[in-house]
Amino acid sequence: ELLEEGEDCYCHIPPNPCCDPATCKLTPGSQCAEGLCCDQCRFKKKGTICRIARGDFPDDRCTGLSDDCPRWNDL
């Protein structure tokens, strides 16, 4: 899903309680609307596993500052 210019979140079908369907902006108090590090409109805590490790690589973990799940080597 690609956001259009001026949108904070994808506000189309299905409805998302974190995203205002009229403005495509986050609802008051929401930090995020979706993503591996978003839970109930809030960023998951720093260190929360968002992607299980494969092979010799460590688990990917949330930063607590974003809804994205960075790859271990992006930190």
Curated annotation (Swiss-Prot):
Main subcellular location of this protein, as a coarse class: secreted
Record's miscellaneous remark: The disintegrin belongs to the medium disintegrin subfamily.
Keyword terms: Cell adhesion impairing toxin, Disulfide bond, Hemostasis impairing toxin, Platelet aggregation inhibiting toxin, Secreted, Toxin
Descriptive protein name: Disintegrin CTF-II
Coiled-coil boundaries: none
Classification lineage: Eukaryota, Metazoa, Chordata, Craniata, Vertebrata
Assembly: Monomer (disintegrin).
GO annotation, cellular component aspect: extracellular region
Compartment list: Secreted
